[in-house]
């Protein structure tokens, strides 16, 4: 070893010794970091549409998002659900019309289900079905208003979609939603091979898809051939890293405290938030079908998505993780003309074509 190399090596050892001295005992008084205020420019690697959208939008106001939930005991969930439903219904009706998707409602095993049929089916999907689970924090998205993304999937993948209008709180907390999905899936298996079924959704719907597969496994059911998890709410505890790092940055969710935190408790009722049927990230992912995953760098559920992906890969499951620069929670579902949206659903179609039998 030369004199110069010995000098560099000695400095490296000294630096490592310093780091060792700093952790972990020197942080015993405070395990939290305080981050200074910072400016975030529109991300250069995002699409022009997304950059423009971010540039023309004010930074999310965390304080305003928390305000309605300061007195959570007196909060009127039913009024908020009714207000959201009216808006969601109008959006769904416009989207279904614009995408030329035919919608019919039916009851399956006592569960309300919407069937969405595209104008033209992909010949490869003639006898295939996508079992869709809507998002909405396990509280919103009931009825017609929950089929918007189902219509997008039907149109872009040219596949028949069954959207499960599962029961939700306040009247029907956990495990009602999981029970409804299992009931519909069992009925579907009577006429459709498991290899011809895909399941999935966005946000709470993605989390519910993962929880449902845990339940399918527990009941020894044949598993679907493919899973779509768009930014899954897979951990309802406030422990995921991006819940903190992307608070006030995610333009959709904004903050966990307030709506998300209250919805988590409302949904779980008295059950443990770490129950894998509530927070599927805590479950066993061995034997899972292939999973197509979407998130963004400004998504508060980025960590949930990453954690599920890591567990899938440790279990040896094929998992296709796609992270879009600058995208907030489920941003791909809001602007269908954006490259982020077109790539998300275009690649989903290819994923379904690859795995549906």
Put a short name on every predicted segment.
Residues 29, 53-75, 95-357:
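Alpha/beta-hydrolase superfamily serine-hydrolase fold, recognizing
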Residues 1, 5-10, 18:
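N-terminal export leaders
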